[in-house]
């Protein structure tokens, strides 16, 4: 096979000649290779001009009339913790490899698509999701695309732009002054005072943060597609970018729009998740049965062994949360989501089905899940065989518990926040990139502080998968809402400890003195086991979260009980677990400068690493 790596580097031109260069590429180059379509040259040059020379690379396969176009998508805008949760390398671009007909380009067969990161060899699930999305996008575009159609649209567009000067100047203007998109993920700021505080530089930062932007035209009368955009996708990340710079730029723009919001869509059907409190951090499958079957068939849920090996303490916690929710008297309300698990003996049926809940069967399978401590002490395959003998649904249930978690949880080194007096400390991030971007914008305007949120261990199975929701006046509410609707927080640990221990029928709020007497016993009660034990030893668990909250006028402070009605203004940061009533100091106040300094020290090394 004749394979030649051909990279095209042509000099740019200005003024009146810019149109011909942009639309047709450099004709001298095409004269030597008549089989290479000039529109392909033009589209490649457009990528180089709008992005950079390094954003595209080409390899020709002359004897079979094929060409591979590698488009490099910069994902450095993702936070370090987000990229870790998604298992991508933010320092390395994602490569979209499209194979076209060299001589026919858009008139030829639909291009094949590969999505990869050169250094990311295993577990690149995000690439599978993006490949599926871009495949569907290309199939839709290919129904009306042709070289002549694209050339005609670009010529019309260029004629319209001539009065405004060169194309480069126009693009520069677009890159600076393009409006903030009207997107469900990034709503337009309506508050007039807020608009006043946001100057032009701040708007530019906001536009860069909100990378799920679609390319929308300021003048809606100018139609560059030849057909109106679908109303179903109008106004969010599924908007079809303009074709004015060619198909290669269009698909790059579409990929850039979709990447920051991949967590908001099902990895199988690409339909938006429906959650009470918006999207979560990790991409996941939706609850549609067809998607569940496809998800299982694709083998995406086969990562249990890796998770147990690399994050055994986290898996231990997830199982404990699932058990607490399943054994709760309120399980019909709080055990949500209910597992969707394919029957290993009959892959066409669901052994556990949210539409046909069977808590007794689920309890039996969960009881057969061996302790994570045991799993780490031997061969995972041998452990799996033992579980299969006990109950064939035990291992599939464990896979579901791991894969359905949509938050990023990492066990911290022992006693990172020493004032919390527990070895079971976790970094807990559940907010998707869109919410974190909105949170940071609000933080710049109003500032933030830290406060505790107490909720019983049985509630966290749902919180990790559905988010920290405003449960006031809903069936999820347990403690009342004396201070109105919102997420309840407190700067005082004793108050949150009280909420965290009230999940089993106790509805009276203990006084602070009672809590101090009951819980502040770290130095008076003999320890029956090492406090530094790696895994949870007991099923009698208490937990609280440490959250970062925006200090805007929306935050209502009623003494030491705070209520935040805006869910976007609360982000979980840390999670602490205590066993057998052994909890920390009940007098911790997050507003104490010493406490704040310690929190910021750990936050600086764990959350804002970039």
UniProtKB/Swiss-Prot annotation:
- Keyword terms of this UniProt record: ADP-ribosylation, Glycosyltransferase, NAD, Nucleotidyltransferase, Transferase
Where are the ADP-ribosyl aspartic acid modifications?
A: 580
User: Source organism's superkingdom?
Assistant: Eukaryota
Please verify whether the record's keywords include RNA-binding: no
What are the recorded GO MF terms, alphabetically? NAD+ poly-ADP-ribosyltransferase activity; NAD+-protein-aspartate ADP-ribosyltransferase activity; NAD+-protein-cysteine ADP-ribosyltransferase activity; nucleotidyltransferase activity
Q: PROSITE patterns per the record?
A: PARP_CATALYTIC (PS51059)
Q: What's the Enzyme Commission number for this chain?
A: 2.4.2.-
Q: Which reaction does it catalyse?
A: L-aspartyl-[protein] + NAD(+) = 4-O-(ADP-D-ribosyl)-L-aspartyl-[protein] + nicotinamide; L-cysteinyl-[protein] + NAD(+) = S-(ADP-D-ribosyl)-L-cysteinyl-[protein] + nicotinamide + H(+)
Q: What PTM annotation applies here?
A: Auto-mono-ADP-ribosylated.
SUPFAM superfamilies, alphabetized = ADP-ribosylation (SSF56399)
Catalytic EC class: transferase
Name the Gene3D superfamilies on file. 3.90.228.10
Q: Name one GO biological process term.
A: protein auto-ADP-ribosylation
Q: What are the PARP catalytic domain coordinates in residue numbering?
A: 374-600
A Pfam match: PARP
Q: What function does this protein fulfil?
A: Mono-ADP-ribosyltransferase that mediates mono-ADP-ribosylation of target proteins.
Q: Which family does it belong to?
A: Belongs to the ARTD/PARP family.
Q: What is this protein called?
A: Protein mono-ADP-ribosyltransferase PARP6
Q: Which organism is it from?
A: Pongo abelii
